[in-house]
From Swiss-Prot:
ATP binds at K22, G23, G24, V25, G26, K27, T28, T29, E231, N258. One of its GO terms (biological process) is tail-anchored membrane protein insertion into ER membrane. Belongs to the arsA ATPase family. This is ATPase ASNA1 homolog 2. Homodimer. ATPase required for the post-translational delivery of tail-anchored (TA) proteins to the endoplasmic reticulum. Recognizes and selectively binds the transmembrane domain of TA proteins in the cytosol. This complex then targets to the endoplasmic reticulum by membrane-bound receptors, where the tail-anchored protein is released for insertion. This process is regulated by ATP binding and hydrolysis. ATP binding drives the homodimer towards the closed dimer state, facilitating recognition of newly synthesized TA membrane proteins. ATP hydrolysis is required for insertion. It is found in: Cytoplasm; Endoplasmic reticulum. CDD domains: ArsA. Its main location: cytoplasm. It is an enzyme of class 3 (hydrolase). Zn(2+) binds at C267, C270. It comes from Paramecium tetraurelia.
Length: 325
């Protein structure tokens, strides 16, 4: 298969693109360059960093925060940096605010929500997806955190479903408890009404997650691009990523291999490293023979700013083969 990302650019139905891999392999550079290519093709594009150690600001050489901001010098491109692991106290959970006037009730319901591991992050992720979808971008690109964090992020819809089932069970237990202490919670009718309001909000959030989950499993709308370098640990993480995404039924058929050294007669160390890399490159080409495997040479300078990204963009579209050592 052609060793470029042209197949991604030529797919008109794509809506969501996730870019991920091991830390320090060039995910942000790759995702930012891809976002630049889409924006230049005329698509209204946003790139969102979900990595707590954000690098988009450095990559675009522009201050980027928690709200979408237009990238200077590139039409149709916006960016934002978010933390999917929001502090529950700052998260707009569909629970307490506006429903309960009694502090004891608020406290108990807060405990009920927090008793489900990962439910706050799942709801935060759902809120993010819902808000991004409402922004009406043609394409959303996620510059994700290192592999383990990303896999957990992509598994949030399953967490949400399990969490909601547990909350429903706790709900009836909590209602039985409330009936024994009506003086604390007010009348049973008032409490039931408040609980129904809360769970109506949660069900709405579940619907959002379900919709997002369906889109993520639609290969015509969503794809994942793996990024790695030609070293053992990175190759191992890439295979783990491919296996997990396959289990989640999320499409992945592109892998970008960064920092590839080409032989240089004037540099013995470069040649030694290139020889070591070739072993892993050959293995990856063989393992992913049904993937678009893009080989990206090690850059002389740090890829930063619009000019640096434009050069990197060109390389993503130029086919290169494994260097002969």
């Amino acid at each position: 298969m052609e060793p470029t990302l042209k197949n991604i650019l030529e797919n008109p139905s794509l809506k969501w693109i996730f870019v991920g891999g091991k830390g320090g392999v060039g995910k942000t550079t790759t995702s930012s360059s891809l976002a630049t290519l889409f924006a230049k093709s005329g698509k209204k594009t946003i790139i969102i960093s979900t990595d707590p150690a954000h690098n988009l600001s450095d990559c675009f050489d522009q201050k980027i925060g928690g709200q979408p901001i237009l990238i200077k010098g590139i039409d149709n491109l916006s960016a934002m940096e978010i933390d999917p692991t929001v502090d529950p106290d700052k998260l707009k959970l569909p629970t307490l605010q506006g429903f309960m006037n009694d502090q004891a009730t608020k406290s108990l319901l807060s405990e009920l929500i927090s008793s489900v591991p990962g439910i706050d992050e799942a709801m935060s992720f759902a809120e993010l997806m819902n808000s991004v979808d409402e922004m009406k971008y043609d394409l959303i690109i996620f510059d994700t955190a290192p592999t383990g964090h990303t896999l957990r992020l992509l598994n949030f819809p399953n967490i949400m479903e399990k969490g909601l089932n547990k909350l429903v069970q706790l709900r009836y237990n909590f209602q039985n408890l409330a009936s024994q202490f009506q003086g604390l919670f007010g009348s049973q009718e008032e409490f039931d009404q408040q609980m129904n309001q809360m769970f109506s909000k949660i069900e709405t959030m579940k619907d959002t997650v379900t919709k997002v989950n369906a889109q993520m499993k639609d290969k015509n709308k969503t794809t994942f691009i793996g990024v790695c370098i030609p070293e053992f640990l990175s190759m191992y993480e890439t295979e783990r990523l491919v296996q997990e995404l396959t289990k989640f039924k999320i499409d992945i058929h592109n892998i970008v291999i960064n920092q590839v050294l080409f032989p240089d007669d004037q540099c013995k160390m470069c040649n030694a490293r290139a020889k070591m890399q070739k072993k892993y490159l050959d293995q990856m080409i063989d393992l992913y023979d049904d993937f678009h495997v893009v080989i990206m040479p090690l850059q002389e300078n740090e890829v930063r700013g619009i000019d640096g990204l434009k050069q990197f963009c060109e390389l993503l579209l130029k086919p290169k083969t494994v260097p002969q050592v």
